[in-house]
């Protein structure tokens, strides 16, 4: 490569002393370590997968392997397994693309292991990005532009949904987000792309990922006497983009509580 020094007179004037930035112009790049080498399937792995696929109980075995440290919640484990495996995206006539990823929303009472499910997916999925509704903004989830402090040029930076491309994006405390921030992810959840036009930069970023989010109901407890949409502070457009809605209720059941205590 070529080693150069980048000199910016305006930056030097502002700081009051010479400032040089090191720039290395590469002529060739040789990749030494492959981060995904451990995930590549060998012929033995493929034969073992085909053997497992012929098992009539493979579905139950997969669901049972989801978060084994959490007792019960078979419906949630089924939804998470479906989201991790995903579906098949379709390109209709080369003009309209239908996403294959499955978006899941977990809504339930406090202390029902919703966040633990998200943490399990974060550690299990090949590519997973974790974010919280209270600490994430529209720019942090989608994309934004910033000015480089040295070159003073505008650069494009992807958010959590872009970084989770071909993976899973996990959002905890989804109901704590601002309405404007939630509106910004409508395109990413349905079209799986993010369009940005700021500071002279016009681009479309890929966000081909499944979204698994967790939220708390209004007033802390789920009310079964009213519809799902009235139990959570989410608008109808955002709810319609979730394929699976899971409700987790903390019911008083002495038998289940005793079985849970024995499991722990």
Set out the residue ranges of the language-model regions.
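Conserved ASCE/P-loop NTPase catalytic core
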Residues: 58-264
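OB-fold and OB-like single-stranded nucleic-acid-recognition modules
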Residues: 2-71
